[in-house]
Amino acid sequence: MPKRVLTGTVVSDKTDKTVVVLVERKVKHPLYGKIIRLSKKYHAHDEQNAYHEGETVRIEECAPISKLKSWRVLEKADKASAA
């Protein structure tokens, strides 16, 4: 099974080797049809502490690293789109 890859914004980089990434998605309400923005925060592993608050990054699902971390940062999202 392929690993899930999500794109989001780093909202916290205060912990060592960890960043908190906010991922937003839009869904349509099943009854009323209104488009709703839903968001979720993921703790992602950042080995070199290379990513900082406000940056847009891509994260990939991985084996659990700790109680909260089962994602790791792949790269900056703007760098990925330029390549």
From Swiss-Prot:
Signal sequence segment: none
Pfam families for this protein: Ribosomal_S17 (PF00366)
Keyword terms of this UniProt record: Ribonucleoprotein, Ribosomal protein, RNA-binding, rRNA-binding
Any one cellular-component term (Gene Ontology): cytosolic small ribosomal subunit
GO function term, MF aspect, one: structural constituent of ribosome
InterPro entries cross-referenced by the UniProt entry: NA-bd_OB-fold, Ribosomal_uS17, Ribosomal_uS17_bact/chlr
UniProt GO BP: translation
Cited function: One of the primary rRNA binding proteins, it binds specifically to the 5'-end of 16S ribosomal RNA.
Assembly description: Part of the 30S ribosomal subunit.
Family: Belongs to the universal ribosomal protein uS17 family.
Protein's recorded name: Small ribosomal subunit protein uS17
Taxonomic source organism: Zymomonas mobilis subsp. mobilis (strain ATCC 31821 / ZM4 / CP4)
